[in-house]
């Protein structure tokens, strides 16, 4: 899923949902678990 893409650095530069660094794999999990969190 998204973790794999992040691991490859494809979605790393753009993590607007979490606002975390490129090493954060929470891009997908955060988005699914709490999409309205605003992080």
Curated annotation (Swiss-Prot):
It is an enzyme of class 3 (hydrolase). Residues 1-39 are annotated as: Disordered. Optimum temperature is 45 degrees Celsius. Optimum pH is 5.5. Its EC number is 3.2.1.21. Signal peptide: none annotated. GO terms for biological process: cellulose catabolic process. GO terms for molecular function: beta-glucosidase activity. Keywords: Carbohydrate metabolism, Cellulose degradation, Glycosidase, Hydrolase, Polysaccharide degradation. It catalyses: Hydrolysis of terminal, non-reducing beta-D-glucosyl residues with release of beta-D-glucose. This is Beta-glucosidase 2. It comes from Passalora fulva (Tomato leaf mold).
